[in-house]
Design a protein with these regions (language model features):
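Conserved acidic donor-binding segment of nucleotide-sugar-dependent glycosyltransferases
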Residues: 331-332, 336-343, 352-357
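Carbohydrate-associated surface elements
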Residues: 166, 188
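A short helix/loop element that forms part of the nucleotide-sugar donor recognition site in Leloir-type
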Residues: 141, 195-210
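Short hydrophobic beta-strand element within catalytic cores of glycosyltransferases
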Residues: 316-320
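A short, well-ordered alpha-helix in the C-terminal region of glycosyltransferases
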Residues: 345, 352, 359-373, 384-385
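N-terminal subdomain of nucleotide-sugar transferases
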Residues: 1-57, 395-396
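Aromatic "clamp/platform" in nucleotide-sugar-dependent glycosyltransferases that forms part
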Residues: 299
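Short alpha-helical donor nucleotide-sugar binding micro-motif in glycosyltransferases
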Residues: 278-279, 286-291
Length: 397
């Protein structure tokens, strides 16, 4: 049985974004495939230093005090890595790890040192790049530092995992990594998380945001520039004019939140929608079921999990024609795409779906088979194959 140490800066119940959910689902699915999984992460005082959950052994360091100044974030990450390294060394004395698997730049330093100490292969999953998040502008701190760490760790790793072919090309081009060392393994979804819920409760929830005869447009994600919510707001006046009674619902939080509120006020949209802020998974999954349309207007998108979850929940979706969204949403098959950064095109496609209920139903129906590609079992199987190949190579060396 392969024993792997996975490092992630977040893991439930500590959730910053999608990474925590991804690592948990992957870890638990790997356990079902006879991989012994240990996760090294951070946690608050309320979380146990060590526990077994879903078959995964979770080890937590106490979280260093979080800085309020973004400029101090890099130093905070370095302290976290130092603490993780110390904890990882102790774990290495207790267990014999066959492989180290790190997620993103935030744990790169600790991963590299631990892999060398254990004389074990190193796998790194790159979920997004700083270069992509900032459209290539990485000449200022902390972007320069983060970009440098990403380049360094991808070239140090024995194998890099990317969530889409788009990301594999980006990693190869930006960091100079041989594409042969980059495995494409998509993110997964768990249909059980998206099962139908009490209809009365869903009706009550929808009534908080829209009347029965109105159309509800949903946007979910971190409120940051690269997610493109500002483009969706720019498209809303025309959408409301063409499809009277259209309302929007934005769920998420982030550094761009105040600007989006200001933009909505300037466009006269505040009476036509709601900013929900950060929400938990239970509410998140319900929102897909009460919406008439999910919009993913990203400027930069390595994968596109929101689109997958929307389709799996029976909600039609339209997405920007960019990045991994091209692979997740085949155009005119399971969803519709519009040119990225084009609010007019976004409005036109949204109007088309909201004005044609049959089109929406057909898109959702066609998505059923497509979604089978993203089952967590398959994702874990592909990951376990990467592990087995590297461990086998190491044993023969």
């Amino acid at each position: 049985m392969t024993r792997v140490l996975i490092l992630s800066w977040e893991y439930p119940p500590l959730i910053e974004g999608g990474l925590a959910r991804h690592v948990r689902k992957l870890s638990e699915a790997l356990v079902e495939r006879d991989v012994e999984v240990h996760v090294l992460t951070r946690g608050g005082e309320e979380s146990p230093a060590e526990e077994r959950r879903g078959g995964v052994v979770i080890h937590r360091i106490r979280e260093p005090k979080r800085p309020t100044d973004l400029g101090e974030f890099v130093a905070w990450v370095e302290r976290m890595n130092s603490d993780m390294l110390a904890a990882g060394v102790e774990l290495g004395d207790r267990y014999s790890f066959d492989l180290v698997h790190g997620h993103d730049w935030l744990v790169a330093n600790a991963c590299d040192h631990l892999a060398k100490r254990f004389d074990a292969p190193l796998v790194t999953t790159i979920h997004a790049t700083e270069h992509g998040r900032h459209q290539g502008w990485v000449d200022k701190h902390p972007q320069t530092y983060i970009h440098g760490v990403e380049r360094w760790i991808t070239n140090r790793s024995d194998r890099v995992i990317a969530c889409s072919h788009y990301m594999r090309e980006q990693i190869a081009d930006i960091f100079g990594v041989d594409e042969g060392r980059v495995s494409v393994i998509p993110n997964g979804i768990d249909p059980d998380d998206l099962q139908p819920q009490d209809e009365e409760e869903l009706t009550r929830l929808r009534s908080e945001f829209a009347a029965p005869e109105e159309k509800l447009v949903l946007l979910i994600g971190r409120l940051v520039y690269e997610k493109g919510f500002q483009l969706a707001l720019e498209a809303m006046p025309r959408l409301i004019e063409e499809v009277p009674g259209t309302r929007f619902l934005i769920a998420g939080s982030g550094t761009h939140e105040a600007e989006l509120h200001k933009q909505a006020e300037e466009l006269g949209l505040m009476e036509h929608g709601t900013f929900l802020g950060w929400i938990g998974d239970d509410v998140l999954h319900s929102l897909y079921k009460i919406a008439d349309l999910t919009v993913v207007p990203s400027i930069y998108e390595p994968f596109g999990l929101v689109a997958l979850e929307a389709m799996a929940s029976g909600c039609p979706c339209i997405v920007a024609d960019t990045g991994g969204l091209r692979e997740v949403v085949p155009h005119e098959e399971v969803g519709l795409r519009f040119p990225a950064r084009d609010p007019e095109a976004l409005a036109e496609v949204a109007i088309r779906v909201l004005s044609d209920d049959e089109l929406g139903r057909n898109l959702v129906a066609e998505a059923y088979e497509h979604l089978r590609r993203f089952d967590w079992g398959d994702v874990a199987e592909q990951t376990a194959e990467v592990y087995a190949g590297l461990v086998g190579e190491a044993s023969r060396a």
